[in-house]
Structures are given as structure tokens and as C-alpha cells.
Amino acid sequence: MLYSLLYGYFNINLFQYLTFRAGLGFFIAFFLTLFLMPKFILWAKAKKANQPISSFVPSHQNKKDTPTMGGIVFVFATIVASVLCASLSNLYVLLGIIVLVGFSFVGFRDDYTKINQQNNAGMSAKMKFGMLFILSLIVSVLLSLKGLDTFLYAPFLKNPLFEMPTMLAVGFWVLVFLSTSNAVNLTDGLDGLASVPSIFTLLSLSIFVYVAGNAEFSKYLLYPKVIDVGELFVISLALVGSLFGFLWYNCNPASVFMGDSGSLAIGGFIAYNAIVSHNEILLVLMGSIFVIETLSVILQVGSYKTRKKRLFLMAPIHHHFEQKGWAENKVIVRFWIISMLSNLVALLSLKVC
């Protein structure tokens, strides 16, 4: 909107630069989140919109009055910044907004159910999975109709492994959406644990998206060119900015939780960025913390069902370390370090080989 007005009508050349608009979107989303979040916290406390804490985590019972659904605020701030700074005629931008709104809506339904029923279960797994599946399928089909190529790339290799048939590609993309959104959701168990690794992952993916959308950079780095995808860089940095604003209130001890309305939106948007920039496999490295958290749950459940023994004191694995006596801040910061290093290694793939 602002982009179309200032560049399209008034020909202010500064707005033709993607990096300027992305930076502007970052700060708009950041300050808007900073401004709106205290108001949301006051409203949520008045409405007693706090998520019940699981009885299996007694050390967290002091957080039972902390309001949740803060994700609504930073998703809203991201969309406002994107509408102002991005080109809304770009299909990748529109699909990115659909992903944020759609996944956040599913999370909101889950958060609302938890608050309304005053339990930690939320929606039924079948209902939640079904809504996420339908949304993922719609976006994946639209990407296919848009003409996004279906080559599968491996980290540090410049040539694709093979070209997936359309149906296989759509199914694979749906899997990426579902696994990533739920992985971020599982990670959101400690103050700031999900938001900072999400920031690192989004920053890495935003670089890949920028390179993919830039003819000169993609040619120099032998990176697959994706026409028009560079505009997604604006939304990615806007989401990073809003997450920094959210972290202002979510750092330990948290004044607000993002809830599923935030974690599912982040996970869905991370998956979307990975798909359009051909980083579905590299996402395992960039989102290493999310992968570790998810694997810990899968292994814990699998071990208990087959051997009646638990591999960890508690899953997801961040609770295991808490049970071992690690302070919450120690778990959080060490996981941040792992995430940062993983993303630095992932970025090396741009130039290596």
C-alpha cells in the first residue's frame, strides 16, 4: 500500500529498493508490537486469557497467570508492516500473508479452546491436524499452479538431486508445512525458547529468499533462481522485527506467551520460506532445535509404547534438562547457541561447493 503509493504514484525511488522496504518493515513491525503488546497483556489479564500449565511441570506453576495468545499481536504487526511495505501484486507475498493468517487462526482456535475449557489439551488432535492439513494442501497446490519448480536440492550441492513429480512435490510440501509448524509449537515451552531460534532461522531463510529472487546474486552463487520470490524478503524481516518486539515481553520471566496462535504461524511461515527457496532439506539444519525437540517426543513415545521405558526424564527435551536440575535460563541460552551455530553453518552452503 505505502509501496504502491510512494513509488507507484509519487515515484519516490527509495521505495524501489527491496532492502530499504524490508528494513522499514522490520522497524514498523517491531515498534508496533512494542506498542500493542502491553495493551494486549492488560486486556488478556482482565479476560483471564491464560493457558493452564500442565501438572507434569510443577516448576512452571508460577506461570499459570501469564496471558497467552500473544502471537496474535506479532502476526498482526507483521501483516500491517507487509501491507505497507511489500508489493501486494506479488503472489508469493499474498501466499505468505495467507500462511501467517491461516496458521495463526488454527492456533487461535486451539488457544481459545484451552482457555475456555481451562485445560492444556485444546482442540482434538484430529480437528487441529485436519485444519492444518487442508491449509497446507491449499498453499502447496497454489504454489504448484504458480509454477514453482519441483527440483529437490541438498545442502552444499549446487545441482538438484532430482525433479519431483507434481503430486509428490505437493505431498512433500504439505509434509514440510505440517512437520515444521508442529515442531515450532513443541519447542514453545520455555520463555524465549521458540522465538530466538525462529529469528535465527527466519534471518537465514530471508537471505536465501533474497538471493533466489536476485538475478545477479543467484547467478554468482549458482543458486536456483525463483522469479519474483525476493519480495518475500520484506515479510520475513517484518516477522523478525515483530518477534524482537515480542521477545521484549517474552524474555524470562515472561509477561506473555505466544501460544499456538504464534508458534503455528511462525512454523508455517518458516516452512513456506524453505519451500519457495528450495531449502526443504537444509531446513533440518537451520531449524535444528525444532528437529531435536520433535525427535525427543517421537523417541519418547515410541520407546514407551514398544518397551514401556522412557528415554528421557520428560519430553520435549527442554523439560528433560530442567528435570536434571538445569536452570531455565541455562537451557534457553544453550539452545539459542546451538540454533545460532546451526544457522551459520547453513549459510556457508551459499558459497561452499
Swiss-Prot record:
Which GO biological process categories is it annotated with? cell division; cell wall organization; peptidoglycan biosynthetic process; regulation of cell shape
An example molecular function term from Gene Ontology annotations: phospho-N-acetylmuramoyl-pentapeptide-transferase activity
Q: Report how it sits in the membrane.
A: Multi-pass membrane protein
| Reaction(s) catalysed (UniProt annotation) | UDP-N-acetyl-alpha-D-muramoyl-L-alanyl-gamma-D-glutamyl-meso-2,6-diaminopimeloyl-D-alanyl-D-alanine + di-trans,octa-cis-undecaprenyl phosphate = di-trans,octa-cis-undecaprenyl diphospho-N-acetyl-alpha-D-muramoyl-L-alanyl-D-glutamyl-meso-2,6-diaminopimeloyl-D-alanyl-D-alanine + UMP
Cell location: Cell inner membrane
The answer to whether UniProt assigns keyword Cytoplasm to this entry is no
Q: In which pathway does it act?
A: Cell wall biogenesis; peptidoglycan biosynthesis
EC class of the enzyme, as a word:
transferase
- Any one cellular component term from GO for this entry? plasma membrane
Q: Would I find Cell membrane among this entry's keywords?
A: yes
Q: Which parts of the chain span the membrane according to its record?
A: 24-44, 66-86, 88-108, 129-149, 160-180, 192-212, 229-249, 256-276, 281-301, 330-350
Per the UniProt entry, the Enzyme Commission number(s) are 2.7.8.13
Needed cofactors, names only, are: Mg(2+)
| Keywords on record | Cell cycle, Cell division, Cell inner membrane, Cell membrane, Cell shape, Cell wall biogenesis/degradation, Magnesium, Membrane, Metal-binding, Peptidoglycan synthesis, Transferase, Transmembrane, Transmembrane helix
Q: Which family does it belong to?
A: Belongs to the glycosyltransferase 4 family. MraY subfamily.
What does the protein in this record do? Catalyzes the initial step of the lipid cycle reactions in the biosynthesis of the cell wall peptidoglycan: transfers peptidoglycan precursor phospho-MurNAc-pentapeptide from UDP-MurNAc-pentapeptide onto the lipid carrier undecaprenyl phosphate, yielding undecaprenyl-pyrophosphoryl-MurNAc-pentapeptide, known as lipid I.
Per its record, how is this protein called by name?
Phospho-N-acetylmuramoyl-pentapeptide-transferase
User: What organism is listed for this UniProt entry?
Assistant: Helicobacter pylori (strain J99 / ATCC 700824) (Campylobacter pylori J99)
